[in-house]
A protein has these predicted regions:
Chain A
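Conserved N-terminal subdomain of the carbohydrate kinase-like
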Residues: 11-23, 40-123, 137-142, 295-325
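Alpha-helix C-terminal capping segments
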Residues: 34-44, 252-254
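Short, conserved phosphate/pyrophosphate- and ester-handling motifs at nucleotide-, phospho-/glycolipid
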Residues: 36, 175, 242
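Short beta-strand scaffold segments in enzyme catalytic cores
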Residues: 34, 83-87, 215-219
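Conserved phosphate-binding/catalytic region of the ribokinase-like
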Residues: 189-325
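Conserved phosphate/ATP/ADP-binding segment of small-molecule kinases
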Residues: 137-145, 152-226
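Short catalytic helix/loop segments, enriched in acidic residues and glycine
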Residues: 19-35
Length: 325, 325
């Protein structure tokens, strides 16, 4: 199954309470494609984005090693790659942005190469909703699933565009604060259902609300699935965790001909696994060379920490008197 | 199995964005015992607390109807019952305390009646840690399990007392903010393990961190269990939800001769069920007359929303090459 990933390719300078890394590899498309590569064949993954001539050599080598098709990545002569610098606070849940230099990303107009205009799965990383819509309009064939991300900046600044994009999308991945901002309701359950109503009506409507250390909620048609977080003792660098989640999720889905609830639930759990690994080293370091053993081990751990047995005293018949359970 | 509940018995005036209730029944011991009564026989539940002559007649009738032994509830002649008034904000997660009149609770010295000094299970609701310790010292026989609650007020104002109490306790129920305050670490996983170290060393060490809408984390010896929250669309009145959780949890445990991990996991889920019902009406109204059917239905729903199937392509042997999962 082919997978097209559209998003940012960036250079990040990251400071945490423990360490600092200058000009590391970053960007939503980077994390998404790397995380997806554990499930999809590298050669089935196409990237669309823009970089400057300073995009790190090791990143090109990494993409090449994975077999990604980077023909959709525009390299701007004399241009500089999108640069972000941020500093995480002690609790790792909040961060200050120190620098955002859009550089070549400021004029990004995604051009999907002809050979990528009919992917099975389309992932729209967090870019302007109008650009996400533009990419959808470049599709020659309707993908099995279009999944997108967004952020506060677009919810408050480009809501009309965002609503138009969501109406063409089958799955939305969003964090809890963004969900509440977009729906304007305190209950995440209500938010999830209202967000589903914003999506394309001609397919399953899938909403995934990421809650960081509290796991994720999946809304799939009328079903709700509550996924646990992987119980990490320490977070080294949370940059890209949300994108790794999305990549693990969509990567896993590309293994399947059809979208089914049981499969999407597992995909959310694999997304959780990739996000957990992402946090354990700087930048993309932890998700560059995982083994499937490492991934499956955490999948099983998540199953173990969230499962409980049914009531042994119960039979099919429900007793209604207290004391007879 | 006998259960002794020590805590506050109160009268609450509660205002939410939707409605208001004057002088409703409240108090930690009230919610705990009512929630526990669905699993334990009423006559096995003893209450220790203090009230004034104004304690509502319908509360006495309710306790009597459940069969609770209230011989440990002191009625102070001419005294007034602990009174709390609060107002919830729009998001229902935050509230302002408008009035706290300790009244007879100010001089509360728990006196455990002789017949209750060897309960199988002892629950210490949120009162001063020195009083919790005093109750433990009144025990003639070591209970199978001593479980306690606490709050910010004691963590900051009576930490030494609290640590002495915890060292005699087998299980602690605490919310996420309190856990971080007591341990001073941002990771709840680290907090859970550090809190376990504070508990009595001669038994299972059980810590339950309540995360409200995000569910709960159970730390049981070296195991972690992540329990989902019940997906409520609307919260009517969250007062007493934490105590109802504790009551459902301990009530369920009294059905068992021994403390086992699988049982404690289910107990956490039943606690979640009782807390979810508690939020659906004012005060104790929703947990006064539940059927076991209603309780078990939500237990099964929680099992359904949190379960996912193992990877169908996997066998016992872990493949380590990507693409062969």
């Amino acid at each position: 199954m082919s997978l097209l990933v559209v998003g940012s390719l960036a250079v990040d300078t990251i400071e945490t309470p423990f360490d600092k890394r200058e000009r590391a590899l970053g960007g939503s498309a980077t994390y998404i494609s790397l995380a997806a590569s554990y499930f999809a064949h590298g050669s089935d993954i196409g990237l669309v984005g823009v970089v400057g001539e300073d995009f790190p050599e090791h990143a090109w080598k990494l993409f090449q090693g994975k077999g990604f098709d980077t023909s959709g990545v525009e390299v701007i002569k004399g241009g500089k790659t999108f640069f972000w610098a941020g500093k995480y606070h002690y609790d790792m849940n909040t961060r200050d942005t120190l620098t955002t230099d859009l550089n070549v990303f400021a004029d990004f107009k995604p051009k999907v190469p002809a050979k990528h205009t009919s992917p099975d799965y389309l992932v729209l990383g967090n870019i302007a909703p109008s650009l996400q819509l533009d990419v959808i309009n470049q599709m020659k064939k309707k993908p099995k699933l279009i999944i997108c991300d967004t952020m506060n900046f677009w919810i408050t600044g480009a809501k009309d565009d965002l609503m138009k994009t969501l109406a063409k999308v089958n799955a939305l991945v969003i964090n809890d604060g963004e969900a509440r901002l977009l729906v304007d309701h305190p209950s995440l359950v209500v938010c999830g259902h209202k967000l589903q109503e914003m999506l394309a009506p001609d397919n399953h409507r899938i909403v995934i609300i990421k809650k960081g250390e509290h796991g994720a909620l999946l809304f799939y048609d009328q079903f709700i699935f509550s996924a646990p977080a992987y119980p990490l003792e320490e977070i080294f660098d949370p940059t890209g965790a949300g994108d790794s989640f999305m990549g693990g999720l969509i990567g896993y889905l590309t293994r399947w001909e059809t979208i089914q609830y049981a499969t999407v639930k597992r995909a959310v759990v694999y997304g959780t696994v990739l996000a957990s690994y992402c946090c354990s080293k700087f930048s993309t370091e932890a998700i560059e060379n995982l083994s499937m053993d490492q991934i499956y081990r955490r999948f099983r751990e998540l199953q173990s920490i969230s499962s409980f047995e049914d009531e042994p005293f119960r039979t099919q018949k429900h007793d209604s008197a207290a004391g007879t359970m």
